[in-house]
Amino acid sequence: MSDIAGEARKIALQNAVSHGGRAREGAVLAGLLGARPELRPKAGELMEEISDIVAGINAMPESKQREELGDVPVERKKQEGQALPPLEGAIKGRVVTRFPPEPNGYPHIGHAKAAIINEEYVTMYGGIKILRMDDTNPGAERMEYYAAIKVGLDWLGIEYDVIKNTSDDMDLLLSKGRELLESGDAYVCTCKRDDMSKNRRAMAPCKCSKKAQEDHMEGWDKMHGKFKPGQAVARFRGDMESQNTVMRDPVLFRIMEERHPLLGDRHRVWPSYDMAVAIEDSIDGVTHAFRSKEYELRNELYGAILGKLDMRAPMVLEFSRLEFEGMPVSKRVIRPLIEDGKIPWYDDPRLPTLEGMKKRGITPGAIRRFVISLGLTKADTLAPFGALEAFNRKEIDGNSTRLFLVGDPRRIDVAGLPGTAELPNHPSGDMGSRKIETGGALYLPGKDAEGLSEGGHIRLMGLGDVRIDSAGRDLAGTYTGDDISAGYPKMQWVPCGDARKIKVVIPRAPIKDGEFDSSSLGILEGMVEPHYLQVGDGQSIQFVRFGYCRKESQHMAVFTHG
């Protein structure tokens, strides 16, 4: 068995024993790609092997699954937090929500907000959570993005009762399009795009709308074969004089010949977002459809489409978009930064992508609490990143090992220094302690060392007091005891003999005054005490008098916040 297959099998076993003996292919793929990001471009190829692995594990008795796995994974704790406001029209046990991301990019904080709100209301009232990939734009969708979304949601701790794709229902969506044409509530338009836009601005009816019914049905058939992309679209027969521009005969179907990542070239006529989301929400049994405020004007069209088709209409609710100042969520902004080499990838800690925030050390629990604290307001504001940091600080403080980090290190030789120091790993005392061999020579922070003078005193944190005997190029001192009441200036330190050199990446907002800030990623090179090597990769650390960081590797940490 290959390493990849072995890892996938372990993830599948963990998923199975956590869900009554039944593993899910999507969850296994998400877990594998989360652990091995380099495999994302091969997500499509991996699915076949994962399907076989999952089928085999699901055929095993649960006792055998547990036996092979060994230790059963601990279930994630539900995060506590403020409650969202009551949900209008909610019936206990019958709330159905959906999160419908388009697999055309990596998920970000805005996706997290939508997903969490949908999940929280089902948790509050009971019901069904649906994950539905809104994948009806074949040229933009990629298997890599389907996988990235699932990885992000899994990291957030969100699980779904139903997972599907809008493209699963293409035959139904096309039949509903034909139904609208047959009832006269839609028509086929062959106008050029510029002419369509001009008529909509002028509130002038399209000449195509006046054609005979049989012409529209013939045009619909030609859209599936003879017409080329851009030569024809199917439009909703709305109201060209409406003050709501969305209702001025919007496009419902268009021709696109790009291969779809799941369906290949099976279809060339694809529904617009407005057509697809309305039909899907209705047939999926959604009771409350949440979407961001930017879609508010489209609610009238949403209801009109379902009304013409005599289909059930869910309640639609809006919330404001979530963005941070200087931290773009738009693909139109992020992609050029990556393509131009200004930002290496979507997991850059300067970005508000889920991968970027994970790398920075922001926790899923902090994101959830932050989102809930914002409520359902529709007022568009740029949220302060500091507010998220405050929630994160509460999340990570209790399990962040305290360590010393010395930037721009200056050596000092100290006579009479105790050979070892025992320091608590956390002020609470709940995380044990560590011993450091001092060796008689230490590194001090260069900035602090600049202010030292002969005859002065400093207190080495957790070690004792030192008199400065030489403050020139070569620092030297003498240990004078451990009198904390003396009130000497405190300094962190690391032993010269066992100190480890690391880089600390310091992310800042990448956009300043509308332009990319080339200085937005700072680097601090310093020396850290040897216990750093014992901390697991991905764990949170608080470097004393510096801030919280996430350990990326034995040689690098990422600054989270102060």
From Swiss-Prot:
Its EC number is 6.1.1.17. It catalyses: tRNA(Glu) + L-glutamate + ATP = L-glutamyl-tRNA(Glu) + AMP + diphosphate. PROSITE patterns: AA_TRNA_LIGASE_I. GO terms for molecular function: ATP binding; glutamate-tRNA ligase activity. GO terms for biological process: amide biosynthetic process; glutamyl-tRNA aminoacylation. It is found in: Cytoplasm. Belongs to the class-I aminoacyl-tRNA synthetase family. Glutamate--tRNA ligase type 2 subfamily. The lineage of its organism: Archaea, Nitrososphaerota, Candidatus Cenarchaeales, Candidatus Cenarchaeaceae, Candidatus Cenarchaeum. InterPro entries: aa-tRNA-synth_I_CS, Gln/Glu-tRNA_Ligase, Glu-tRNA-synth_arc/euk, Glu/Gln-tRNA-synth, Glu/Gln-tRNA-synth_Ib_cat-dom, Glu/Gln-tRNA-synth_Ib_codon-bd, Rbsml_bL25/Gln-tRNA_synth_N, Ribosomal_bL25/Gln-tRNA_synth. It comes from Cenarchaeum symbiosum (strain A). Keywords: Aminoacyl-tRNA synthetase, ATP-binding, Cytoplasm, Ligase, Nucleotide-binding, Protein biosynthesis. This is Glutamate--tRNA ligase. HAMAP family: Glu_tRNA_synth_type2. Disulfide bonds: none annotated. Catalyzes the attachment of glutamate to tRNA(Glu) in a two-step reaction: glutamate is first activated by ATP to form Glu-AMP and then transferred to the acceptor end of tRNA(Glu). The keyword Cell membrane does not apply. GO terms for cellular component: cytosol; protein-containing complex. A motif ('HIGH' region) lies at residues 101-111. The gene is gltX.
